[in-house]
């Protein structure tokens, strides 16, 4: 309810924001990206929302593009609109910059990204304790945050994903409770969110 997620299966517990963003980068994006595809990040990003995408771009041949900020330190929405095109598969942005405190209009970005059938990934680590989070109203595909940003313990986090997107994700870690059935040569996995 707090995130306004449409169903509980859309909320996956992780070890933190970095883990959640890596799961999206390597479990969702990497298997789908190919040479000629584009990933857009901004200069406002924490390393946790930049380095995984650099790695995915290098491994897939996708092009990593970077949107800047305007003279006030805000995301340059005009430049973002120029960068997004039919090759854009992923736009991944912070909701609030950890350096400047810049607040990104996520709903505005989502409208633009979805016009081109891209996905929007949001790093909400800095926003979660200070701003209301409504994943449905913002229309994000994925959103990540950590418990310690809300005075919780370290080592816990959340990955919200639209259910259809989560179902398309490949696991990035294997074993434990995620396994439904295992044979000497293969395994099947539990349904979301355990998988």
Model-derived regions, located:
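Pyridoxal 5′-phosphate
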Residues: 1-195
């Amino acid at each position: 309810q707090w995130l306004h997620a449409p169903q509980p299966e859309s909320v996956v517990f992780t070890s933190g924001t970095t883990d959640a963003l890596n799961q999206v980068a390597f479990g969702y994006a990497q298997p789908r990206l190919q040479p000629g595809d584009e990933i857009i990040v901004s200069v406002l990003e924490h390393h946790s929302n930049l380095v995984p995408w650099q790695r995915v771009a290098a491994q897939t041949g996708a092009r990593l593009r970077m949107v800047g900020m305007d003279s006030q330190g805000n995301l340059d929405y005009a430049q973002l609109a120029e960068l997004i095109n039919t090759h854009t598969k992923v736009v991944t942005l912070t909701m609030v910059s950890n350096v400047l405190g810049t607040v990104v209009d996520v709903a505005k970005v989502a409208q633009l990204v979805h016009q081109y059938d891209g996905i929007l990934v949001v790093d909400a680590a800095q926003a979660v304790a200070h701003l209301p989070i409504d994943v449905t109203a913002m229309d994000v595909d994925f959103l990540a945050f950590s418990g310690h940003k809300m005075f919780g313990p370290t080592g816990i986090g959340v990955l919200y994903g639209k259910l259809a997107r989560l179902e398309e994700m490949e696991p990035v870690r294997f074993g434990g409770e995620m396994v439904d059935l295992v044979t000497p040569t293969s395994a099947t996995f539990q349904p979301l969110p355990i998988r």
